[in-house]
Amino acid sequence: MKTIPLLFLLFIYFECDGKFIRHKDESFYECGQLIGYQQYCVDACQAHGSKEKGYCKGMAPFGLPGGCYCPKLPSNRVKMCFGALESKCA
């Protein structure tokens, strides 16, 4: 049972220099199957100031929200692009 927290800590360590942007219409479980989703991720991450190319990444094994992963952004947070936060998304 100690391996799960350790894996989670390693995951947090390696993902701490970016953030996720979730598509406002689709769940992250389906993002790899959507036509044009990879380009959406590239464009959305660029609009949020990412210096590197964004991509679709699921986090279902961790029970966490996922979607577009934007490397090396100034802040570490999950941004949900729907509901009350929709106006804050690119």
Swiss-Prot record:
Gene3D superfamilies: Knottin, scorpion toxin-like. Disulfide bonds join C31-C56, C41-C68, C45-C70, C81-C89. Residues 19-90 form the LCN-type CS-alpha/beta domain. GO terms for molecular function: sodium channel inhibitor activity; toxin activity. One of its GO terms (cellular component) is extracellular space. Keywords: Disulfide bond, Ion channel impairing toxin, Neurotoxin, Secreted, Signal, Toxin, Voltage-gated sodium channel impairing toxin. Has the structural arrangement of an alpha-helix connected to antiparallel beta-sheets by disulfide bonds (CS-alpha/beta). This is Phaiodotoxin. It comes from Anuroctonus phaiodactylus (Mafia scorpion).
